[in-house]
């Protein structure tokens, strides 16, 4: 038996080969008898619904039952008895229901004599429904989905333009909900999402033309958004059942009606209704209740024939158990009588669980007779492996083949490998279809080629086998240094795919193992190599659809390759979606892929951005701790993956461009490749400079032996201890080689480092100041810096030499100028600190130089952070123009925060400044302001390590302190001048607003716990609390001013 190709997805791609399409019904092979039948169906796949079809080969003895069986088998249907095959003439709308026992060859011979083959359409449909069919179909998902698609298609073609607008809107929105089950309920509120639905998918797919033409676009959008919200919480199955519930009152899809007459002559004109609930009934007019004639289990035999009158009407006779005579029905034609007979026969077989037909009819010549002995086709001898179309004439099978495989997909013959040449080794991994092994391929060119072998566990099923081989057929089209190469296939069971072996395994595992040995340039190199592979796929108009670090293989430490093309062609297949829903890479997917199952080069760009993030994070998976169902909500709220530690800002900026919500705003892979190449070159240059810098710093040269052209360290001013001595700072190599250090380049000299005679400062002090010196006025240093790169090491022979006089003079003059400049700046800062003007402070001016707040108790500190020295640190000196900013020493000592820890938050020091010189001994307002500030300080100190459930008690304490304060102010208000009341009330309202903002930020921090935004909202909580404390101080100032005004008014003039 020749191979059967079961997947219907591949038969819709236009072919450039010599393929003769014979319309909707048949495909003709030149010079051969018709052996191929195209059957349309409603098994959903990624193509347009009008093209859902399977190509079937048949022999002379193949019957309709065999055709149906082979189609439903590959979709794992349970209720096979519900299916029937309908033949329609496209020009005249003539319909024939083909009985299961009819031979396919006889059917084709009979009908193709009347009309050309291209005018016929074969269609698989569900015709016979059991009682309570919806409950039964929910246990058979393929049948439920098939029936839904069939009914929806009939509704759109027959009555959609006549139904009420509200019903049309509901049914359309239910189809949107069913089609895009991962889409959130408010997704259509976003303009870009609605535009995808409107322009790319098309509203005509969901709503009738009459509705789209009669309603304005803006109004229609609002109606769709409002209606869609009603069904936002339904899943796919619930959407289907709701669709049937709304449609059933206006369209009876569960029964068929025929206009006919009861009796052998036109005596009683009726409408015969046949269905699971009615059985066999008739109606005399539309308003009447149906009259029951018989149940299906009462029917014993069915006969039909032509009437003997000149009109040649159809006669249908049913022998009913217990009836004295047969029930006779006269139909307008023999075709209608045959269709009625087939319907009743199908219901009888379904109800009785029988396979034998209840129809009795005369045996026509040639019908169901034994086939003649066929002649053996020449190309049959080529066997299964050549994938020829012909089959043995004696085969009584219906074999589904894929149209594209038959005519357009490249044959695997050139890639076929003899199994004897493969030596199977140890298992090195697991794939979607089976294990992956290491092995040896003994080829003529290389007798011991190391290869990877993908095996298939369940390839006895033709559909599984073909899907498994699809990856090989895809991979053979590519030839790129960073795409895994296909070596060959073995198509006989057990089926194997042989590929090149990447010895270092998956990239994700490789990154985790080599986390501490891989430098940044290597990580960027991997991203760049992947971008070249994906730009190559983009140029071939190919979409990968599963770009992730786990699907990238490491061939060498400087070479990665894109692999795993197994999902590339089947990702949108609805059966695969349902069967492997848990395996979909939701956290890597673009929003339009999650919402609408749309996969394009733009969605690949999004996934590549996530893959780059994985690489920079050394194999950490995205959205750790977030459920798949919650990912789309976070993306639509604007959340994106945070910048990895040590990631260049330019690279992270490129990632964020890949994560643009609108697909049209994402860069193409050709652009990404060019930009990654530039970033890679920049990083390599910086790495080389850092290595040169490190090699220089490794040699410890004392000042008295020369070798240092650094300025001597400045002594600390009295009263201000050295930051290094106070913090015990001694630079480690990683601190001395910061990425943003000044890079020495562009100077060519021929001598070693000259030495300065005499030891002015200890050698250790010189070493300690190297970091500052290297970052100090680089443009000036480069003017005279001698070359240190003549031989890669220091020339020690010149250590005893004395610095030339002119260079010594230049250095001393420059140092003197710098010292004078520093002295002037420090004096200016000291004068500023001494002045301390007593001004009313706002939110922008409340912070002091040391980060604290001035309070009502003079310089008394209400809160002192742990570990803060008693002395005041000198003010920060602004960097000189052109000098790179290194940051504080604390930032040098603090480790880079991990992905999960986020930004560390330190509580702010709050010390309200002194206000009016009033007696505070019995000042309730002052006491409550101080209490509120203390509550804010306590919350600030506890918020960082606190779990989310402890946020509410802390904020509640602040709220109670504020309530007490406002009550005290209300008590004091009557005694204050009336002219000041409005200002005090405004200050109170501002405090209430501050508390509301604090509560809002607290809710956001709780909502986004365990995400990258949690630390940001904690910071915003502290900011809101700080604003509350500042405004409480301002309220005290307003009341003090009112008191002073009252005192001045009471004094005698």
Swiss-Prot record:
Membrane topology: Peripheral membrane protein
Activity regulation (record text): Subject to autoinhibition, mediated by interactions between the FERM domain and the kinase domain. Activated by autophosphorylation at Tyr-397. This promotes interaction with SRC and phosphorylation at Tyr-576 and Tyr-577 in the kinase activation loop. Phosphorylation at Tyr-576 and Tyr-577 is required for maximal kinase activity. Inhibited by TAE226.
Keywords: Angiogenesis, ATP-binding, Cell junction, Cell membrane, Cell projection, Cytoplasm, Cytoskeleton, Developmental protein, Kinase, Membrane, Nucleotide-binding, Nucleus, Phosphoprotein, Transferase, Tyrosine-protein kinase
Gene3D superfamilies the UniProt entry points to: 1.20.80.10, Nucleotidyltransferases domain 2, Phosphatidylinositol 3-kinase Catalytic Subunit, Chain A, domain 1, Phosphorylase Kinase, domain 1, Pleckstrin-homology domain (PH domain)/Phosphotyrosine-binding domain (PTB), Single helix bin, Transferase(Phosphotransferase) domain 1
Cytoplasm listed as a keyword: yes
Chain segments carrying region Disordered: 1-27, 686-741, 843-892
Biased composition (Basic and acidic residues): 686-697
Domain (FERM) ranges: 35-355
Post-translational modification: Phosphorylated on tyrosine residues upon activation, e.g. upon integrin signaling. Tyr-397 is the major autophosphorylation site, but other kinases can also phosphorylate this residue. Phosphorylation at Tyr-397 promotes interaction with SRC and SRC family members, leading to phosphorylation at Tyr-576, Tyr-577 and at additional tyrosine residues. Isoform 2 is phosphorylated on serine or threonine residues, but apparently not on tyrosine residues.
Biased composition annotated in UniProt, kind: Polar residues: 10-19
Pfam families: FERM_C_FAK1, FERM_M, FERM_N_2, Focal_AT, PK_Tyr_Ser-Thr
Phenotype for residue 395 to A: Abolishes interaction with PIK3R1
Residues binding ATP, per UniProt: 428-434, 454, 500-502
EC number: 2.7.10.2
Active site: 546
Residues with PTM Phosphoserine: 911
Record comment regarding domains: The C-terminal region is the site of focal adhesion targeting (FAT) sequence which mediates the localization of FAK1 to focal adhesions.
Subunit text: Interacts with ARHGAP26, GRB7, DCC, PIK3R1, PXN and SRC. Interacts with the ARP2/3 complex.
Task of the protein: Non-receptor protein-tyrosine kinase that plays an essential role in regulating cell migration, adhesion, spreading, reorganization of the actin cytoskeleton, formation and disassembly of focal adhesions and cell protrusions, cell cycle progression, cell proliferation and apoptosis. Required for early embryonic development, embryonic angiogenesis, normal cardiomyocyte migration and proliferation, and normal heart development. Regulates axon growth and neuronal cell migration, axon branching and synapse formation; required for normal development of the nervous system.
Entry similarity comment: Belongs to the protein kinase superfamily. Tyr protein kinase family. FAK subfamily.
Name the UniProt record assigns to this protein: Focal adhesion kinase 1
Native species: Gallus gallus
Lineage of the organism: Eukaryota, Metazoa, Chordata, Craniata, Vertebrata
């Amino acid at each position: 038996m020749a191979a059967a190709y079961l997947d219907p997805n591949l038969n819709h791609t236009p072919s450039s080969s010599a393929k003769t399409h014979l319309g909707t019904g048949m495909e003709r092979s030149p010079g051969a008898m018709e052996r191929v039948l195209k059957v349309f169906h409603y098994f959903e796949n990624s193509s347009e619904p009008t093209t859902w079809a399977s190509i079937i080969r048949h022999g002379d003895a193949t019957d309709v039952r065999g055709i149906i069986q082979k189609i439903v088998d590959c979709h794992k249907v349970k209720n096979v008895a519900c299916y029937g095959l309908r033949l329609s003439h496209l020009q005249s709308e003539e319909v024939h229901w083909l009985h299961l026992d009819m031979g396919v060859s006889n059917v084709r011979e009979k009908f193709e004599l009347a009309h050309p083959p291209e005018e016929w359409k074969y269609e698989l449909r569900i015709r016979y429904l059991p009682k309570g069919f919806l409950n039964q179909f929910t246990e058979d998902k393929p049948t439920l989905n098939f029936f839904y698609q069939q009914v929806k298609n009939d509704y759109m073609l027959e009555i959609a333009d006549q139904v009420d607008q509200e019903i049309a809107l509901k049914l359309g929105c239910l189809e949107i909900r069913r089609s895009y089950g991962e889409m959130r309920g408010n997704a259509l509120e976003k303009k870009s999402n609605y535009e995808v639905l409107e322009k790319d998918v098309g509203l005509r797919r969901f709503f009738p033309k009459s509705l789209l033409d009669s309603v304005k676009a803006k109004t229609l959008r609002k109606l769709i958004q409002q209606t869609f919200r009603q069904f936002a919480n339904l899943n796919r199955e619930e959407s289907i059942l709701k669709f049937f519930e709304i449609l059933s009152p206006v369209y009876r899809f569960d029964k068929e009606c025929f206009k006919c007459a009861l009796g052998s002559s036109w005596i009683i004109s009726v409408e015969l209704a046949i269905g699971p609930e009615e059985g066999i009934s008739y109606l005399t007019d539309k308003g009447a209740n149906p009259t029951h004639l018989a149940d299906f289990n009462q029917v014993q035999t069915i006969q039909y024939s032509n009437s003997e009158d000149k009109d040649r009407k159809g006669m249908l006779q049913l022998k009913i158990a217990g009836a004295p005579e047969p029930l006779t029905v006269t139909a307008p034609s023999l075709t209608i009588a045959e269709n009625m007979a087939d319907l009743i026969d199908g219901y009888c077989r379904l109800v009785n669980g029988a396979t034998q037909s209840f129809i009795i009819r005369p045996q026509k010549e040639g019908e169901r007779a034994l086939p003649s002995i066929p002649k053996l086709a020449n190309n049959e001898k080529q066997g299964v492996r050549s994938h020829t179309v012909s089959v043995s004439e004696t085969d009584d099978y219906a074999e589904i083949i894929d149209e594209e495989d038959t005519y357009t997909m490249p044959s695997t013959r050139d890639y076929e490998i003899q199994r004897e040449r493969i030596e199977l080794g140890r298992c090195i991994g697991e794939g979607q279809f089976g294990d992956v092994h290491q092995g040896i391929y003994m080829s003529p060119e290389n007798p011991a080629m190391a290869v990877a072998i993908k095996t298939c566990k369940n390839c006895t099923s033709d559909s599984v086998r073909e899907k498994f081989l699809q990856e090989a057929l895809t991979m053979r089209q590519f030839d790129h240094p960073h795409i895994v190469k296909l070596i060959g296939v073995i198509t006989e069971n057990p089926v194997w795919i042989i590929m090149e072996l990447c010895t270092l395994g998956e990239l994700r595992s490789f990154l985790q193992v080599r986390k501490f040995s891989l430098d940044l340039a290597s990580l960027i190199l991997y991203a760049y190599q992947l971008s070249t592979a994906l730009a190559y796929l983009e140029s071939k108009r190919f979409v990968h659809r599963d770009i992730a670090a786990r699907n990238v293989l490491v061939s060498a430490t400087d070479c990665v390759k894109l692999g795993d093309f197994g999902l590339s062609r089947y990702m949108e297949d609805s059966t695969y979606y349902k069967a492997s829903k848990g395996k979909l890479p939701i956290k890597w997917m673009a929003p339009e892929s999650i919402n609408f199952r749309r996969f394009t080069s733009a969605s690949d760009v999004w996934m590549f951005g996530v893959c780059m993030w994985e690489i920079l994070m050394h194999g950490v998976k995205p959205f750790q701790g977030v459920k798949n169902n919650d990912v789309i909500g976070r993306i639509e709220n604007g959340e994106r993956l945070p910048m990895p530690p040590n990631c260049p800002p330019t690279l992270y900026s490129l990632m964020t461009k890949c994560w643009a919500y609108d697909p049209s705003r994402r860069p193409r892979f050709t652009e990404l490749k060019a930009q990654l190449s530039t970033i890679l070159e920049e990083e390599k240059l910086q790495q080389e400079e850092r290595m040169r810098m490190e090699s220089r710093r490794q040699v410890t040269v004392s000042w008295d032996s020369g070798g240092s052209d650094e300025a001597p360290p400045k002594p600390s001013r009295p009263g201000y201890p050295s930051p290094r001595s106070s913090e015990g700072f001694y630079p480690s190599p990683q601190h001395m080689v910061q990425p943003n250090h000044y890079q020495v380049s562009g100077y060519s000299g021929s001598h070693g480092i000259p030495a300065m005679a005499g030891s002015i400062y200890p050698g250790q002090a010189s070493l300690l100041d190297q970091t500052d010196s290297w970052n100090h006025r680089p443009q000036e240093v480069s003017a005279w810096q001698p070359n240190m790169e003549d031989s890669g090491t220091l020339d020690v022979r010149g250590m005893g030499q004395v610095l030339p006089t002119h260079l010594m003079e230049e250095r001393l003059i420059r140092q003197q100028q710098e010292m004078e400049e520093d002295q002037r700046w420090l004096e200016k800062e000291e004068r500023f600190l001494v002045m301390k003007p007593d001004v009313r402070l706002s939110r922008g001016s409340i912070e002091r130089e040391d980060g604290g707040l001035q309070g009502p108790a003079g310089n008394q500190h209400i809160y002192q952070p742990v570990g803060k020295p008693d002395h005041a640190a000198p003010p920060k000196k602004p960097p000189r123009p052109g000098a790179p900013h290194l940051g504080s020493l604390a930032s040098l000592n603090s480790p880079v925060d991990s992905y999960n820890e986020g930004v560390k938050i330190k509580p702010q020091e709050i010390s309200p400044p002194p206000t009016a010189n009033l007696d505070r001994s019995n000042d309730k307002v002052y006491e409550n302001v101080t209490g509120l500030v203390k509550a804010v300080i306590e919350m600030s100190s506890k918020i960082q390590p606190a779990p989310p459930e402890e946020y509410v008690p802390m904020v509640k304490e602040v709220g109670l302190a504020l309530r007490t304060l406002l009550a005290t102010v209300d008590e004091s208000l009557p005694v204050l001048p009336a002219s000041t009341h409005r200002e005090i009330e405004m200050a109170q309202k501002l405090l209430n607003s501050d508390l509301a903002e604090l509560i809002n930020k607290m809710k956001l921090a709780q909502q986004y716990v365990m995400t990258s935004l949690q630390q940001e909202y904690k910071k915003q909580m502290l900011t809101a609390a700080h604003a509350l404390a500042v405004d409480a101080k301002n309220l005290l100032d307003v009341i003090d001013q009112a008191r002073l005004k009252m005192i001045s008014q009471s004094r005698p003039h």
